[in-house]
């Protein structure tokens, strides 16, 4: 049997008389005669200077290229965009966050296809760049390895009352809400602002970036143990070099992304997300990656796995610890080994090491859960996973609630309806949102937003105002991985598609039952149905540019808000 061709595509630009011009161009970037026989590896990086999440990627890309060279390949680095959710939060910029996931996937596909690169190492740090890169890997189905930028170290600050606190980005959003209600002096907000980001790296809690990095490791698309070390830790340079070497070995063995991205691999990723109590954005992103890999994945898979996998990680936003602490006690492999030993993971799934997940875990032999940062399965924080899928008269196609950290399973309250986040923020600032209210923010879905904005500004403000346990928030938009409290998102169908959320009115009674996995409006069905007569959705907010294109293509949140 012939060994796999390690240049399955780049021969299109290096071999034969007709490729003289292409070879001439490649000579100008440093290639010589011997290099034309080597596999060409795209090193795709979302490095930029806009946000600390990606600052380490310039350094890590250099180490990846060293690894590719040492393994006998030739690396060619190229860049793609990244949007900072932390900076774009709470204003018009957040409309562009989720669409950046599609732009990243499309741009990586475009370069890889146009230049006929044989494989890729994909580097990302920000929330949407991680799934964007993994979507590209799944779509292209080449030899691919994913590498995370790493998380930021926790900040520390002293407040005006003399107490010292470990703080993350989310504390700033909550401080704004507290200050607006007179519960915190402005000087303390300033102190928190100056401490939350002490250097490079993604937000430190189990927010979206760290959730997706953990999911990537569980999928088998990144090297075992690579998700948890901080961005500044030089172990990351070692993971980067080994990632460059690994992609060449995958080429030699003929292993491509879809060999790794199986249905069972996605079930492993879901289990790890549930055990960590990770971001609800992981549902959108795993659905989208599965779509690109041609794997059938649905909300029912999240429900099924969530019911049997306990929540065992005491991590922010609901817990006490950050990714730095997870790394200190052994990293993501600690959780994976505990789940594997309990029969909750598929150990036979292939990974980018060329070995199975079980073989990887046996090789690195992670310690048992420490009982503090990571609990044992016999003493979980919650007996089921940290995310619950809801259905009901308000969400016939589904909705998502992050149940990790909730003190109650039932909330019944009175609807306060707002068409967009800004109106809700103004009402909170005015003091007109009260205990027992159900704050409904609609026309924020994938099409209606457009872009399915994250509602961190309002959720942080609600918590900062002391209402985090007393107010239920509903939206057809989505939430930051740092969101806490009674928050239901991804409600589908969305308002602009004439979903039931479009017909809620101030004063309607709404019931959330987490145990029953239901979300209902307590209004006579005949009366509620009568409101649908003559429904006319709002005119599109954007008629030109990328968001106008996005609205024409994007699908429901229930299938990952994918575009085609």
UniProtKB/Swiss-Prot annotation:
Pathway(s) it belongs to: Amino-acid biosynthesis; L-isoleucine biosynthesis; L-isoleucine from 2-oxobutanoate: step 3/4; Amino-acid biosynthesis; L-valine biosynthesis; L-valine from pyruvate: step 3/4
The cofactor note from the UniProt entry for this protein is:
Binds 1 [2Fe-2S] cluster per subunit. This cluster acts as a Lewis acid cofactor.
SUPFAM superfamilies reported for this sequence: IlvD/EDD N-terminal domain-like, LeuD/IlvD-like
Q: Which domain of life is it from?
A: Bacteria
Binding residues annotated for [2Fe-2S] cluster, in chain numbering: 53, 126, 203
Q: Which cofactor does it need?
A: [2Fe-2S] cluster; Mg(2+)
UniProt modified residues of type N6-carboxylysine: 128
Enzyme Commission number(s) of this protein: 4.2.1.9
Keywords assigned by UniProt, alphabetized: 2Fe-2S, Amino-acid biosynthesis, Branched-chain amino acid biosynthesis, Iron, Iron-sulfur, Lyase, Magnesium, Metal-binding
Which family is this sequence assigned to?
A: Belongs to the IlvD/Edd family.
Q: What is this protein called?
A: Dihydroxy-acid dehydratase
- Species assigned in the record: Mycobacterium leprae (strain TN)
